[in-house]
Amino acid sequence: MHQVISATTNPAKIQAILQAFEEIFGEGSCHITPVAVESGVPEQPFGSEETRAGARNRVDNARRLHPQADFWVAIEAGIDDDATFSWVVIDNGVQRGEARSATLPLPAVILDRVRQGEALGPVMSQYTGIDEIGRKEGAIGVFTAGKLTRSSVYYQAVILALSPFHNAVYR
């Protein structure tokens, strides 16, 4: 059984990690241990590079806390080009897989507040009345009318980031 350290305690992210690992390695093939670690970037990262750095930092910090795990996984959400997206970073001590998620364009009323220094999650919670929306369906669930959720979009990115770990051509 793979010991997987999730560099987050966010249920939406943990669900995506678990589903993706089970899809690739088989049901019941992994045990997820969530840990809260620092990203080293602002609460609301802007731009692809800052967001990717946050995910990389989280993986590195989780690895320092739990060096005996098989995998360390981080999902860092950010804002870039008027849209929200995330970077997924997965490390197994030998190689690293990284993937960027799909992007969701955000309406100006939301972006204006985020650009003024507020994080997307709290802004969306105020806009929708859904407490801790970032730990649930997220802006993605709201603006796609539930057709996608934060977790479902992250799931795809985790699957992509796992590609180097089960395809020999990457080695």
Swiss-Prot record:
InterPro entries named in the record: ITPase-like_fam, Non_canon_purine_NTPase, NTPase/PRRC1, YjjX_NTPase
Similarity section: Belongs to the YjjX NTPase family.
Quaternary assembly: Homodimer.
Cofactor: Mg(2+); Mn(2+)
Protein name: Inosine/xanthosine triphosphatase
Keywords for the protein's UniProt record, in alphabetical order: Hydrolase, Magnesium, Manganese, Metal-binding, Nucleotide metabolism, Nucleotide-binding
Domain of life where this protein originates: Bacteria
SUPFAM superfamilies: ITPase-like
Cofactor binding, note field: Binds 1 divalent metal cation per subunit; can use either Mg(2+) or Mn(2+).
Molecular functions (GO terms): ITPase activity; metal ion binding; nucleotide binding; ribonucleoside triphosphate phosphatase activity
Any Pfam family hit: NTPase_I-T
Gene: yjjX
HAMAP family: Non_canon_purine_NTPase_YjjX (MF_00648)
Residues that, per the record, bind Mg(2+): 38, 68
Organism field: Salmonella typhimurium (strain LT2 / SGSC1412 / ATCC 700720)
Entry annotated with the keyword Metal-binding: yes
Entry binding sites for substrate: 8-13
Catalysis performed (reactions): XTP + H2O = XDP + phosphate + H(+); ITP + H2O = IDP + phosphate + H(+)
Function field: Phosphatase that hydrolyzes non-canonical purine nucleotides such as XTP and ITP to their respective diphosphate derivatives. Probably excludes non-canonical purines from DNA/RNA precursor pool, thus preventing their incorporation into DNA/RNA and avoiding chromosomal lesions.
This enzyme's EC code(s): 3.6.1.73
GO biological process: nucleotide metabolic process; thiamine metabolic process
